[in-house]
Each structure stands twice: as C-alpha cells, then as structure tokens.
Amino acid sequence: MVREEVVGSTRALQWKCVESRADSKRLYYGRFILSPLLKGQADTIGIAMRRALLGEIEGTCITRAKSEKVPHEYSTIAGIEESVHEILMNLKEIVLRSNLYGTRDASICVRGPRCVTAQDIISPPSVEVVDTTQHIASLTEPIDLCIGLQIQRDRGYRMKTTKNSQDGSYPIDAVSMPVRNANHSIHSYGNGNQKQEILFLEIWTNGSLTPKEALHEASRNLIDLFIPFLHAEEEDINFEENQNRFTVPPFTFPDRLANLKKNKKEIALKCIFIDQSELPPRTYNCLKRSNIHTLLDLLSNSQEDLMKIEYFRIEDVKQILDTLQKHFAIDLPKNKF
C-alpha cells in the first residue's frame, strides 16, 4: 500500500495518487486528489469523471461459448459437476486484459477428472487472463471437455439474447466494465471569497487495468467529447430563416487541420485524436494498440517505427502519409534522427 499526506495548497492545479493497493488479482484500489479548485468545480469534475469511469471505459470479456451435444443451456453433462448454465456463469466472471479490437476466438480442451480453471483457456497472444485460478468446471470422470469461446472488446453491459443457437453456441451476458466502482468527495478549505476545494476520487477496478490507467482513459474520453467545442467560435454557424432553429456545420477532421495550419502549437496537436481522422478502421486500431492516440503521438514516430507495429502494412503507412501530406503538408521521416 502507498500513502501520501494530503496538504491544502494554493499552487497551480495539480493531481496526485495518495493511495494505491491491490486487494487481490481482481480488485485494485486507487485514491487520487485534484487541487486547488474553485468552489463548485470539484463537484462538476467529480460527477463527469465518475460517469466516464463507469460507462466509457472499454473492457474485454467472453461473449459466447460453444460446445457440441448440448441440447440447451440448462442441461447437465455426465461427468461434470456443474450444469451448462453454471459453466456459462463462471465464464462470464473471467477477467481478461487486452487491447484487441473486434472479435477473437479462444478455446478450452481438457480431459478429466480434474478441475478446470481460467488457466486452461487457450487464447490469442494479445489476450491475458488476469486471474488464472478462477473456477470454470469440475470434471469428475475421465471425459473430454471442449468449449469454443468468443472474446470481444466493448464497453458497458450487453444482455444476451434468449434464443439458443442451433449449433450449440450460447451467448453470455457481456460485462465490459473494468471499473467496479468510483466515488468522489470534496474537501473545502479557506475563508470567505478565498474558499477553495480539493477533489478526492476513489476508483476500484477488476484488475484488467489499474485505477491510474482507468483515470487516464476516462480523462481522454472526456476530452474527446469536448473537442468539437474547442474552436466553436471559429466555426461559421448557419442560421436558418427561423430564428428559433439553427444548423451547426458538422465537425470534420479536414476543418480542424485547416485551423492547425494557421496555429501549429503543440497543445493543438494534442487535441487531435486519431479516431477523428479519416484513417481506415484497421489502421486506427493498429495505432491505438501501440498507444498512438493523438496527432502529436503520430508525428513523434518515423515510417520505420510505424512498420514495426504489429499487423501494420506498407499500405497503412502510405495512407497515413497521404493524410498528413494532404492536410498538413508534412512528411514523416523514414528513420529516426
């Protein structure tokens, strides 16, 4: 456990982690502070951050299981202690860590008698089981158990369909919520008009990411939501003849880049996220898996660096070069200086 003393301050706005601990492989806790804030700001930030932590962060989970000769979800299999439904519920609880996008296949193939745990899941290299001791099933006889699994990255909670598949495939309630809980509290200090606030933010995660990582991703998601308003005063708003109605021109990547040509400040580059670009989904996913999130991140790499990214092709590099040349008249260097 790590603890630091919290002291009120009138210095520039800053944040720090004042407590961090791992209660188990599937329960991490972190406590953070942000200060000094003006009266009312702490509650504004705290509410928005809590919503982003609980609803905007993506997670990876098992969404479907398939096994032959299973008539329905509530049936039992000779030689297995648990029912099919209980096995599906155990698979639902498996915590995975991954940066994958799209759907991946995994499997379990074991022979009893033995206890089947998360360690027996055969998954792609990009997927990691957080707690390999998580129980799945108990085989009481020398039988073979083979289960095909489908793994997907998403966010929030998705209810399974009630209809069973004809091929022995059963959907699982997808709980893609790495943050178990998040709370915020406010400490006020000072007198009269000099009153200021300290925001305390508590985060519990399931082990697939740390509270600090969750805070970083939630902050990035919030920034991404507000980007269209950053230069709203520079956009031309087209008012219709009816004064009670108006149409705002859609936010597009080329429009933003046109503004950046006039103002190539580093902070502006940090405000352009690659998910707002015109890059194909495949290229975008490869970049994000390599922690390239903003235009500034992208411009910090050479063509040689991009080619080292897993699953990246020369066509992807050309697409990026074309986009940068078209909107910025900038070329990425072939090699690092």
From Swiss-Prot:
| Compartment annotation | Plastid, Chloroplast
From the UniProt record, list the reaction(s) this protein catalyses. RNA(n) + a ribonucleoside 5'-triphosphate = RNA(n+1) + diphosphate
The record's annotation in InterPro entries points to: DNA-dir_RNA_pol_insert, DNA-dir_RNA_pol_RpoA/D/Rpb3, DNA-dir_RpoA, RBP11-like, RNAP_asu_C, RNApol_insert_sf
Give one Pfam family, short name only: RNA_pol_A_CTD
* EC class name: transferase
- Could you say which protein family the record assigns here? Belongs to the RNA polymerase alpha chain family.
Gene designation per UniProt: rpoA
Q: How does it assemble?
A: In plastids the minimal PEP RNA polymerase catalytic core is composed of four subunits: alpha, beta, beta', and beta''. When a (nuclear-encoded) sigma factor is associated with the core the holoenzyme is formed, which can initiate transcription.
NCBIfam families attached here?
rpoA (TIGR02027)
Region annotation Alpha C-terminal domain (alpha-CTD): residue ranges? 265-337
Q: What is known of its domains?
A: The N-terminal domain is essential for RNAP assembly and basal transcription, whereas the C-terminal domain is involved in interaction with transcriptional regulators and with upstream promoter elements.
Q: Name one GO biological process term.
A: DNA-templated transcription
Q: Where is this region: Alpha N-terminal domain (alpha-NTD)?
A: 1-233
Q: Which GO terms describe its molecular function?
A: DNA binding; DNA-directed RNA polymerase activity; protein dimerization activity
Task: Tell me which Gene3D superfamilies the record gives.
Answer: 5' to 3' exonuclease, C-terminal subdomain, DNA-directed RNA polymerase, insert domain, RNA polymerase, RBP11-like subunit
Q: Which residues form a coiled coil?
A: none
Q: What does this protein do?
A: DNA-dependent RNA polymerase catalyzes the transcription of DNA into RNA using the four ribonucleoside triphosphates as substrates.
User: Which EC numbers characterise this protein's activity in its record?
Assistant: 2.7.7.6
> Per its UniProt entry, which superkingdom is the organism in?
Eukaryota
From the Swiss-Prot or TrEMBL record, give the protein name.
DNA-directed RNA polymerase subunit alpha
A single GO cellular-component term from the record reads: DNA-directed RNA polymerase complex
Q: Which UniProt keywords apply?
A: Chloroplast, DNA-directed RNA polymerase, Nucleotidyltransferase, Plastid, Transcription, Transferase
